[in-house]
Regions:
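Positively charged n-region of N-terminal signal peptides that target proteins for export
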Residues: 1-7
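Bacterial N-terminal signal peptides
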Residues: 7-17
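Folded, non-transmembrane soluble domains that reside on the lumenal/extracytoplasmic side of membranes
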Residues: 21-173
Length: 173
């Protein structure tokens, strides 16, 4: 009887967890998904073009997603699962990047596939958010902050492996 009750309680906990009820915006053929509607149309079109050209040039896929609600989830976990759901990056190389912004919750994250982690480390991603994106957001320029963040990420993933490793190692922790 105890095992039946324990099994039922565990099953209920799994069903009731935020991950089980997770809904993601749809990736509809362009690398920018602005569900939170914070990027003006002209800037969104320019970002889409830039990100498609970056993918063509490097083979690495970078997407920008804005969401109005994380549904109670941690942003890093949400970004990771969003990348898996959308199948960002090459399946074999695991080299995708998700730049996720949840403006209503004042959260940002850069989720990096394992294949790009030596190039775009957690420390460097944190520096990009802290030193490049956040100042623009605080000044009320969210589209500018997103653009500058994309530029910093794109610059890093276009470096040679040696240059990228040197820059990543120099990022303050």
């Amino acid at each position: 009887m105890k095992s039946l009750v324990l099994g039922w309680a565990l099953g209920f906990a799994l069903v009731a967890s935020p991950a089980a009820a997770q809904t993601f915006p749809k990736l509809a053929g362009s690398p920018v998904v602005d569900q939170a509607d914070i990027i003006p149309a002209a800037e969104e079109a320019a970002l889409n073009t830039q990100l498609l050209e970056l993918q063509q040039k490097t083979g690495h896929q970078l997407v920008v997603a804005t969401v109005s609600d994380l549904e109670g989830n941690d942003i890093a976990d949400y970004g990771y699962r969003l990348g898996r759901e959308w199948q960002i990056g090459d399946k074999e190389k695991d080299d995708g990047v998700v730049f996720l912004i949840a403006p209503n919750e004042r959260r940002m994250n850069i989720s990096v596939g394992y294949g790009l982690e030596p190039v775009l480390t957690d420390a460097l991603s944190g520096r990009i958010i802290r030193d490049v994106v956040t100042p623009k957001f605080k000044a009320g320029d969210m589209p500018g902050g997103i653009q500058d963040g994309v530029n910093a990420i794109a610059e890093q993933i276009q470096l040679t492996p040696e240059e990228a490793a040197t820059r990543a190692a120099a990022a303050p922790r």
